UniProtKB/Swiss-Prot annotation:
Organism: Mycobacterium marinum (strain ATCC BAA-535 / M)
Pathway: Lipid metabolism; fatty acid biosynthesis
Protein's name according to its UniProt entry: Long-chain-fatty-acid--AMP ligase FadD26
Gene Ontology biological process terms in this record: Actinobacterium-type cell wall biogenesis; fatty acid biosynthetic process; lipid biosynthetic process
Entry function: Catalyzes the activation of long-chain fatty acids as acyl-adenylates (acyl-AMP), which are then transferred to the multifunctional polyketide synthase PpsA for further chain extension. Catalyzes the adenylation of the long-chain fatty acids eicosanoate (C20) or docosanoate (C22), and potentially the very-long-chain fatty acid lignocerate (C24). Involved in the biosynthesis of phthiocerol dimycocerosate (DIM A) and phthiodiolone dimycocerosate (DIM B).
Record note on disruption phenotype: Deletion of the gene produces selective loss of phthiocerol dimycocerosates (PDIMs).
UniProt keyword annotations, A-Z: Fatty acid metabolism, Ligase, Lipid metabolism
Length: 584
């Protein structure tokens, strides 16, 4: 069946017909049992329950209406999401409000998407109902507790309705809570992107082992968690073993144990998770276990630190983890998820580039004589018709070695932003001026990320809007943060704070206060500040205007763990950080 004729509901029906009694999803609940209480659904059960939810939803709206999912990580979340799509509605995956604190992001998304219903569970309905209010004169969304529906009693089968637009769900990007942007992801986008990733990670769908197990603790409302944990199993028919993000954070060794105890595992995580796994997994945790069967672990969603990959592979090498297991990957919600990754079976590769040249916008590899430079990780050689480096001002392709904006093209590129036509046109409908032979003129997705092609390989610098421009030179905050993290190990935000003449570099650094006394702690803080200032000067030829040491948890982040640099600047300028070094 051609990709354009398929949908997520049709894929679910296919899996239920072809492998009705095979396990589709297993959720391990570590709150019920420290060893993980397993709840499992077969493909036929998932389909039947999704149909029940779909039938229920038909009483509240029509295909094309939005339905928000605000439920805890678990099987009910999966059934709710698939049920919404089964009814032809547009899903809006969201996180559950936590601990009774008002979640402005949830409120903003509900205002923007105006769902006719909210799917939740009885465990959190009290918190969720507070958000089910009337918006802009529209009726308040109905709140449906999925676990209280009679999910195991089949309802009359109905023809699968589809929204006229082909929209599957709105993936709200992690950015400002005041102006959320919902990426409109179609059924075609999802299927095309999963298929594209199968080529990127395995060499093609036909080379994807049928007995693969997806292992994921990533939140299902996040693009990487949604595609890996729900959509990839739908496309491939593989089994997914899931746990909650909190279960991972409380005990990172659980992730490694699951990777070692299931056949042919494939997983994904942001950079910080690899660090946690290294620091908080003991040899005893993996006693008698073997990681030699792990097919791959995608590293994505945030800046990938070369040192982290090295530490991770070295730490778990005694348990037979392949040096090629970690798969550095580049992607974004506007492209559904996946954009580029190195060739299957290759170990992560890095190249050192001359820092001075990079600040001038040119990638010049350092000589092989130990020259100090900026070490960047390769994201492989993407299809030239799908990825281009473009001058964001002139819209002309950049030659190899020249830094520019990464543009993406293909069936995986999403449809636009929900109810934001002008922003959608600027971002999703770009045109290359005088394209080279073989390069599509458009439409191209402007990613907002800076990258460069060098010797046919893609390297990434960071977000255009996050550039630190000092004395007319471009500095990449990700590089500066990597330098600092090698010293401190915690979360770091390198930000540009404007003064009357230029921008000044300020480093916000999370650090645990250590010392037998207040005086000893201050001595250690002074030492850390001196070491950081020296390292940045040496590695980046850059003076730090201020080094701000703060307690862990102080730096504003998005729901996916990315640093909110604009919020950091605002908080810094208003003296909003609780500084550990105020007397230093």
């Amino acid at each position: 069946m051609p990709v354009t004729d398929r949908s997520i509901p049709s894929l679910l029906k296919e899996q239920a017909d072809q492998r009705p009694n095979e396990t589709a999803f297993t959720f391990l609940d570590y709150d019920l049992d420290p060893n993980g209480f397993a709840e499992t659904l077969t493909w036929s059960q998932v389909y039947a329950r999704a149909c029940v939810v779909a039938d229920e939803l038909t009483m509240y709206g029509v295909p094309g209406d939005r339905v928000a999912i605000l439920a805890p990580q678990g099987l009910e979340y999966i059934v709710a999401f698939l049920g919404a799509l089964q009814a032809g509605f547009i899903g809006v995956p969201l996180s559950t409000p936590q601990y009774g604190v008002h979640d402005e992001r949830v409120s903003a998304v509900l205002r923007d998407s105006q769902p006719v219903a909210i799917l939740t569970t009885s465990a959190v309905v009290g918190d969720v109902t507070k958000y089910a209010s009337s918006q802009d004169g529209q009726p308040a969304p109905s709140v449906i507790e999925v676990d209280l529906l009679d999910l195991d009693t089949p309802r009359p089968q109905q023809a699968l309705p589809q929204p006229a637009s082909g929209s599957a769900y709105l993936q709200y990007t992690s950015g400002s809570t005041r102006t959320p942007a919902g990426v409109i992801v179609s059924h075609e986008n999802v299927i095309a992107n999963v298929t594209q990733s199968l080529y990127g990670y395995f060499g093609g769908p036909d080379k994807f082992p049928a007995d693969t197990t997806v292992v994921s603790w990533l939140p299902l409302f996040h693009d990487m968690g949604l595609i890996l944990g729900i959509c990839a199993p739908l496309v491939t028919g593989c089994t997914a073993v899931l746990l909650s993000p909190m279960s991972f954070l409380r005990r990172p060794a659980r992730w490694m144990q699951l990777l070692a105890s299931h056949p042919k595992c494939f997983s994904a995580a942001p950079n910080f998770a690899f660090e946690l796994a290294v620091r908080r997994t003991t040899d005893e945790d993996l006693a008698g276990l073997d990681l030699g069967d792990v097919l791959g672990i995608v590293s994505g969603s945030e800046r990938i630190h070369v040192a982290t990959i090295k530490r991770f592979t070295e730490r778990f090498a005694p348990f037979n983890l392949s040096p090629a297991a970690v798969r550095p990957s580049y992607g974004l919600a506007e492209a559904t998820l996946y954009v580029a990754a190195p060739e299957p079976g290759t170990t992560p590769r890095t190249v050192r580039f001359d820092y001075e040249s990079l600040t001038a916008g040119h990638a010049r590899p350092c000589r092989a004589d130990g020259s100090v430079g900026t070490e960047l990780i390769s994201y492989g050689s993407p299809d030239p018709s799908a990825v281009r480096i473009v001058n964001p001002e002139t819209m002309i392709e950049n030659p190899s070695g020249t830094v520019g904006e990464i543009w993406a093209h293909g069936e995986h590129v999403a449809m636009g932003y929900w109810q934001k036509p002008e922003q959608s046109d600027r971002t999703f409908n770009a045109r290359i001026v005088n394209p080279a032979p073989g390069t599509p003129e458009g439409p191209w997705l402007r990613t907002g990320d800076l990258g460069v092609m060098s010797n046919g390989e893609l390297f990434i610098m960071g977000r255009i809007k996050d550039l630190v421009i000092v004395d007319g030179r471009n500095h990449y905050p990700d590089d500066i943060e990597a330098t600092i993290q090698e010293i401190t190990g915690g979360r770091v935000a390198a930000i540009a704070v404007p003064d009357n003449i230029t921008e000044q570099l300020v480093a916000i650094i999370e650090l645990k206060r250590r010392g037998a006394s207040a005086e000893e702690a201050m001595v250690k803080l002074r030492s850390v500040k001196r070491e950081i200032t020296s390292a940045i000067s040496k590695s980046h030829s850059l003076r730090v205007a201020d080094v701000v040491l703060v307690p862990p948890g102080s730096i504003p982040i998005t729901t996916s763990g990315k640093i909110r640099r604009a919020a950091c600047v605002e908080r810094y300028r208003s003296d909003g950080f609780n500084r550990l070094d105020v007397t230093v």
